[in-house]
UniProtKB/Swiss-Prot annotation:
This is Glycine cleavage system H protein. One of its GO terms (cellular component) is glycine cleavage complex. It comes from the Bacteria. The glycine cleavage system catalyzes the degradation of glycine. The H protein shuttles the methylamine group of glycine from the P protein to the T protein. GO terms for biological process: glycine decarboxylation via glycine cleavage system. The lineage of its organism: Bacteria, Pseudomonadati, Pseudomonadota, Gammaproteobacteria, Enterobacterales. Residues 24-106 form the Lipoyl-binding domain. It comes from Escherichia coli O127:H6 (strain E2348/69 / EPEC). InterPro entries: 2-oxoA_DH_lipoyl-BS, Biotin_lipoyl, GCV_H, GCV_H/Fam206, GCV_H_sub, Single_hybrid_motif. The glycine cleavage system is composed of four proteins: P, T, L and H.
Amino acid sequence: MSNVPAELKYSKEHEWLRKEAYGTYTVGITEHAQELLGDMVFVDLPEVGATVSAGDDCAVAESVKAASDIYAPVSGEIVAVNDALSDSPELVNSEPYAGGWIFKIKASDESELESLLDATAYEALLEDE
């Protein structure tokens, strides 16, 4: 069973979301997602300043097996990207919940968080897959 940190929120598409300060959230892909994808070779990051809607594909994780879209779990503005992934995409594999984060978003509608899963619900989703 994959590691599912209790303090995070999750999407059904296997993104995680961690609350930071001032309505900003860090986004990455879950340990389960990176296990399915395999070794990362490239991450196509979104543009800082881009405005996205919840569910928009805004990044791509490319692995030795496949390329997978990464979706915005909430609507808002991309305020930072993890530039370290340009040289070290494998951080998504080795540190999916830490150094392997993908982007930070300033949420425009925090009520959208209510549609995300908590750790218990995400674990149940994984059991059903």
